[in-house]
A protein has these predicted regions:
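Cys-dependent protein tyrosine phosphatase-like superfamily
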Residues: 1-89, 103-127
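A phosphate-binding catalytic loop at a beta-strand-loop-alpha-helix junction
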Residues: 88-99
Length: 127
């Protein structure tokens, strides 16, 4: 089972979540799930969107590859995360993409330029 890591009061990250974890995050008051996984990845939770929405959570699958994170793409992701009901769980297969996206989101929100934040994410080995 993957660990859900709370980053701040608005955002948490995880690898692929299980049905039990999905129920747990709903019980803990999460409002939305952002899935970064690609449709062709292995180990996906079957019917994740349907199961998430049945629990009353907002769900978005924004298929994101780490090597394709760029300024334009991150701008779109930033706007999406900003609009999602909070708290939000952001997950991928092993939480590395999730960590990179959340790091970039927080850095941009704090006024750090995208390029500087991206270099830090790269130096941390997240992408």
């Amino acid at each position: 089972m993957n660990i859900v890591r709370k980053i701040n009061d608005e955002l948490s990250i995880a690898g692929q979540i299980t049905l039990n974890q999905l129920q747990q995050i709903a019980d803990e008051g999460y409002k939305s799930v952002l899935n970064l996984r690609l449709a062709n990845e292995t180990g996906l939770l079957a019917n994740e969107q349907e199961k998430t929405e049945l629990l009353g959570l907002y769900y978005v699958n924004l298929q994101t590859q780490a090597e394709n994170i760029n300024h334009q793409g991150m701008s779109e992701i930033y706007q999406l995360i900003t609009k999602l009901p909070k708290p939000t769980l952001i997950h991928c297969d092993n939480s590395i993409r999730s960590a990179a996206i959340v790091f970039l989101y927080i850095a941009i929100k704090q006024g750090i330029g995208f390029e500087k934040a991206l270099q830090k994410v790269i130096s941390l080995g997240l992408i």
